[in-house]
Structure formats: structure tokens, C-alpha cells
């Protein structure tokens, strides 16, 4: 076996890709900061039970596990940063009001999410804690769309769903609630025959409502159909009202509603929003409300947020990260050194050509040169 081979679905990030990823990371974190989000940096490694407080069986399967040589306890390499941020909010910050936090860091997955997906993602996201109202969801949705526009993406489609609809239907029917996981699988997979089989012996109202969910998809007008076909329950009315406001606030993007798109249902407690772009089959960003995320840490605060994979974003983003630079000669000259230092202090990239390598081009576009004219070092176009 060659010593330079990497594990499957693990890859090096080479200069051009790394530069683009870093450019996008800086843009997004700066935008998060402009909204008032504070950055946190949780550790890559934690005790397993701390990492698996939410997310269910899927998160457990995706988490790498190893034994701590100091304590003998089982550790996990994080597969999702969101639970870590919830821990920070609950125990380390322990604030009473609204807290806005953001992050960017590597996560590891035991299995890739798709055929060509990496098992080492760079997750970036933002979270609001402490406000149960829809205003927080509206802000997070706007920030997510803002981030995608900053990355140069267009023709964005925003898919909306709400965990409260299914939760309300199950809460009114104990028999349906006992089959909750199977119903969730059938709805998420749009498996109508299985759904009919699972609902045959349920009450008429619950049966009709559950069977209607796979057909309640389309543009925002489908919410009117949902009001007509679903039971008039306060939780369902509130969920549909929330989706209507989220749809109306999403300016400049295509909006779709799918009341059976319940991926992440076990994790979310309210509105869920997912962003897609043309030509990319998988979601590029996901977000939503998860008010119970801090419960395992003894402090279940209202919470909503979103995240995306920076490596995938860089792959599809048209943002050009190949920077321009100034080419300077290499010489032991105090005036040259002072000129180079001044340019770098001003934010310019200055590359000094090492002796014998003047003809070698790197990935920076050297569109200017630092040359000596009449005893002074000046920048000229190349």
C-alpha cells in the first residue's frame, strides 16, 4: 500500500481550493459579525455522550469513536458542531437573554453523505438562542440566504416545512403516535402505499390528514390547500402561519413548501428551511428551529440556526479567489525591503522571485512589478 494514499472520501485541499474556501469563510464570518453574531470555537474532540445529546441514531452512526488514553472513556470526533454550541450557550455563557453565536470548523463523518461526498466537511453556521418567536427564524433564514448570495449563488430554491404539523397530528392520536417513526419514514420517502397501510386503522380525521401530507407540496399557495385539508388545530394553524411568513420574507428566491419533507424531524421542533440551487442535487444549506437542543445540558432554551459545508459551497461558487499580486526581485537592499514591507502593510500581496525562479508562475496573478526607477522602488503594470 502506498504511503501517500488517503482513506476513501478523504482528500487534501490544494492551494486554489484552499484559497477559495478561506475567501468564503472570511466573507461569511464577516457577514455573521455584521448581524451581531459572536464566534465560538468548540473542540474537535469530546466525550461521546456530550456529542450525542441530539440527532438520534443517524448522528451516532456518523460519529468516529476512540478511547481516551488518559481517562479510558470513549471519545468522539464531532460530526456536527450544533450540539457543541448548545453546550457552550447552556453552561459556559449561561446568558439569560438572546445570544447569537457563529462557528466554522471541521467535522468528521464515518460514512460519506453521497457517492462523491467528503467525510471531512468544513461546517459553518449561525445560531440564535433565547427567543421563541418567529422573528429569530426569519433572521436566520435571511442570514442563510445572505450567505449564499455572498458566495455568488443565484437561482436559489428555498424549501420550507414544519415539524409542528406532524407533531400535532401524532399528539391527538395515541395509536398514530406509537407508529411515529414508521410514519416519519413513510412520509419522508413519499411511500404512499406504506403510508396507507400504516393509517388504515386510524381515526378518520387523522388518517385523512396524514395521507394528505405527501400531496401538500408546491409553491406558497399550497398552504391554503393545507388549511382546507388538515384539522383545525392551534398547533397546525400556527405552523402554517409561520410558513406563510417565512415564504413571504424570502425575497428574490424561488419558494417551495413540502409538508412531507421531514428530514431532521426528530431533531427539529418548528420551521425547517433547506436551500438548493440548479444543477446540484443535494441541499447546499439547512436550517430550522430546535428548541430542545440544550435539554441534555439542563437548559433547554429556544434555538434556531443554519449550517452548510464550506467545501461544497466553494466547489459550486463562482467566486474567483485567485488574487492579484506584485512581483518583486530578491535583493539584500534596505530600500527594497522597506518598499516591500510598506506594500504588505497596505494589504498588497508581494511575491519576491527567488534567484533562478523568475520565470516560474504560481497561482497568484502578478499583474504588477516592483521596479527601481531613479533610485526609488515603484510599482508598475506588467
From Swiss-Prot:
Keyword list, A-Z: Amino-acid biosynthesis, Cytoplasm, Histidine biosynthesis
Broad class of the protein's primary localization: cytoplasm
Keyword Metal-binding: no
Localisation: Cytoplasm
GO biological process, one term: L-histidine biosynthetic process
One Pfam family from the record: tRNA-synt_His
One GO cellular component term: cytoplasm
Gene Ontology molecular function, alphabetical: histidine-tRNA ligase activity
Further information: This function is generally fulfilled by the C-terminal part of HisG, which is missing in some bacteria such as this one.
Function: Required for the first step of histidine biosynthesis. May allow the feedback regulation of ATP phosphoribosyltransferase activity by histidine.
Subunit organization: Heteromultimer composed of HisG and HisZ subunits.
Name of protein: ATP phosphoribosyltransferase regulatory subunit
Organism, scientific name: Burkholderia vietnamiensis (strain G4 / LMG 22486) (Burkholderia cepacia (strain R1808))
Lineage per the UniProt record: Bacteria, Pseudomonadati, Pseudomonadota, Betaproteobacteria, Burkholderiales
Gene name for this UniProt entry: hisZ
Amino acid at each position: 500500500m502506498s504511503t501517500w494514499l488517503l482513506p476513501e472520501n478523504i482528500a487534501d485541499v490544494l492551494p486554489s481550493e484552499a484559497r477559495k474556501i478561506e475567501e468564503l469563510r472570511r466573507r461569511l464570518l464577516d457577514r455573521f459579525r455584521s448581524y451581531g453574531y459572536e464566534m465560538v470555537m468548540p473542540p474537535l474532540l469530546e466525550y461521546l455522550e456530550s456529542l450525542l445529546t441530539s440527532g438520534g441514531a443517524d448522528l451516532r452512526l456518523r460519529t468516529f469513536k476512540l478511547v481516551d488514553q488518559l481517562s479510558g472513556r470513549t471519545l468522539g470526533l464531532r460530526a456536527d458542531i450544533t450540539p457543541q454550541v448548545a453546550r457552550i450557550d447552556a453552561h459556559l455563557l449561561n446568558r439569560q437573554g438572546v445570544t447569537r453565536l457563529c462557528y466554522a470548523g471541521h467535522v468528521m463523518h464515518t460514512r460519506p453523505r453521497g457517492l462523491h461526498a467528503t467525510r471531512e466537511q468544513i461546517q459553518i453556521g449561525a445560531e440564535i438562542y433565547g427567543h421563541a418567536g418567529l422573528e429569530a427564524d426569519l433572521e436566520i433564514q435571511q442570514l442563510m440566504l445572505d450567505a449564499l448570495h455572498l458566495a455568488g449563488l443565484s437561482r436559489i430554491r428555498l424549501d420550507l416545512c414544519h415539524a409542528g404539523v406532524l407533531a400535532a397530528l401524532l399528539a391527538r392520536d395515541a395509536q398514530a403516535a406509537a407508529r411515529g417513526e414508521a410514519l416519519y419514514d413513510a412520509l419522508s420517502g413519499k411511500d404512499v402505499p406504506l403510508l396507507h397501510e400504516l393509517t388504515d386503522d386510524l381515526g378518520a380525521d387523522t388518517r385523512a390528514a396524514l395521507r394528505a401530507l405527501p400531496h401538500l407540496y408546491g409553491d406558497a399557495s399550497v398552504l391554503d390547500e393545507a388549511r382546507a385539508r388538515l384539522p383545525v388545530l392551534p398547533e397546525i394553524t400556527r405552523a402554517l402561519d409561520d410558513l406563510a411568513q417565512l415564504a413571504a420574507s424570502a425575497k428574490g428566491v424561488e419558494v417551495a413548501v413540502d409538508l412531507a419533507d421531514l428530514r431532521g424531524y426528530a431533531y427539529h421542533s418548528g420551521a425547517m428551511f433547506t436551500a438548493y440551487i440548479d444543477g446540484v442535487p443535494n441541499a447546499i444549506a439547512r436550517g430550522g428551529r430546535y428548541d430542545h437542543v440544550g435539554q441534555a445540558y439542563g437548559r433547554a432554551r429556544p434555538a434556531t440556526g443554519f449550517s452548510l459545508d464550506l467545501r461544497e459551497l466553494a466547489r459550486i461558487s463562482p467566486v474567483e479567489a485567485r488574487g492579484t499580486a506584485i512581483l518583486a526581485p530578491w535583493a539584500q537592499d534596505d530600500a527594497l525591503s522597506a518598499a516591500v514591507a510598506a506594500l504588505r502593510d497596505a494589504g498588497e500581496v508581494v511575491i519576491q522571485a527567488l534567484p533562478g525562479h523568475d520565470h516560474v508562475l504560481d497561482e497568484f496573478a502578478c499583474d504588477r512589478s516592483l521596479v527601481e526607477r531613479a533610485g526609488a522602488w515603484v510599482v508598475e503594470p506588467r
